[in-house]
Design a protein with these regions (language model features):
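Beta-propeller folds
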Residues: 1-222, 226-234, 238-243, 258, ...
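Serine-hydrolase catalytic core recognition
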Residues: 203-357
Length: 357
């Protein structure tokens, strides 16, 4: 009965404490951007009406939106504002002594704060501290030092022609990197207490698409994974770093006999010579003589990676009837990092279609 009631709108909120939230919603005329997202962040206490909420921050009407965030990690409680300039660019402000201070990183970089660390993932090449940090890398620095002017980042990941960073997730004591190596998932564990030493996460299914779906970063090193592949139904796994081996918790039922099919990866040359990978799924031992119906799928946009995933419909309605399924990882997606995405933007958009053809 004493909950927070917000009318239907494009809204955003973050808990500050049991009785207080940061709220972005339609507070009336002028409170939404031209994109119809929240233009203001306000502090609302339990029992207050929307008109009583205290203004914390506002952005230009031409910006996409704005969000307020409170981090609850014991000993590292902090408040942040994220100004979303558009789909790919944002600015992060940290409240220091009650005043918002913009973190001096590129607008197209992803930013996260974890305890004493500032983590930065630039999406374009960034020269900082006299060192060129490539697009798609992952950098770490002590937040206090950064605010004081230090720019001596530690490089946690550097992309190459075959490897891209898909995501990163903290547990209580470590950092798990989800990498794509030639469009197959590989997970690596970094330990900040030993200079970010790294080791592979053992037990991750091979040639699958694997994502971290949850961790407990303030309490334990427990982690949960979701794994899938062309012939592997969705599977949930659980482990605890250093104490409990990764094991399957539950899997979806299969919808076709996967033992009949082979999954292969091949590479094709696009018109400009760029090698473009694609997966092929077909009956084992199939003679590829051009006589078999083939379903070709691809996307190539918004830096979205098209990765191996299970489809009962494709398996039962197409593969079991003799069809061949092909998934193409064309440019415009994120399979090889930001550069793979930007290579098919604007005047270069035809490259995505050339890759697909």
């Amino acid at each position: 009965a004493d909950g927070f009631i917000v009318p239907t709108a494009k809204s955003d909120y973050s808990w500050i404490d049991h009785d207080t939230i940061y709220l972005g919603t339609d507070f009336g005329p002028g409170s939404m951007t031209e994109s119809s997202y929240p233009r203001t962040v306000r502090r609302l206490r339990r029992g207050e009406s929307l008109s009583q909420a205290t203004l914390v921050h506002e952005v230009s009407p031409s910006d996409l939106s704005v969000s307020g965030i409170h981090q609850h990690t014991p000993g590292f409680e902090r408040d942040l504002i994220v100004e979303h300039l558009d789909f790919y660019r944002s600015r992060t402000l940290l409240f220091v002594d009650g005043q918002p201070v913009r973190l001096a990183v590129p607008d197209d970089a992803d930013v996260s704060l974890r305890r004493e660390w500032l983590i930065v993932h630039p999406r374009s090449d960034w020269t900082v501290g006299g060192v060129m940090r490539p697009a798609g890398s992952l950098l770490a620095i002590k937040l206090d030092g950064f605010l004081a002017g230090d720019r001596g980042f530690e490089e946690l990941f550097r992309p190459d022609a075959h490897t891209a960073l898909e995501d990163w997730d903290f547990t209580d004591s470590c950092l798990i990197l989800t990498l794509l190596v030639d469009v197959a998932s590989t997970l690596v564990v970094l330990d900040p207490s030993t200079g970010w030493s790294r080791s592979p996460l053992v037990g991750v299914p091979a040639l699958s698409t694997v994502h971290v779906i949850d961790t407990d970063p303030d309490e334990s090193d427990e982690f949960w994974l979701h794994a899938t592949g062309f012939t592997t139904p969705s599977t949930v796994l659980r482990g605890v770093l250093g104490s409990v081996d990764l094991r399957v918790i539950r899997s979806s039922p299969p919808f076709f006999d996967a033992s009949r099919f082979d999954v292969q990866q091949h590479w094709a040359a696009s018109d400009d010579g760029t090698r473009v990978p694609y997966f092929q799924v077909a009956v084992r031992g199939l003679v590829l003589d051009g006589s078999h119906p083939t379903l070709l799928s691809g996307y190539g946009g918004f830096q979205a990676s098209r990765l191996p995933e299970y489809s009962g419909i494709v398996g039962r309605a197409w593969l079991e009837r003799g069809g061949v399924f092909v998934l193409a990882n064309i440019r415009g997606g994120g399979e090889f990092g930001p550069g793979w995405h930007t290579a098919a933007l604007k005047q270069n958009r035809p490259r995505a279609y050339e890759d697909f053809a």
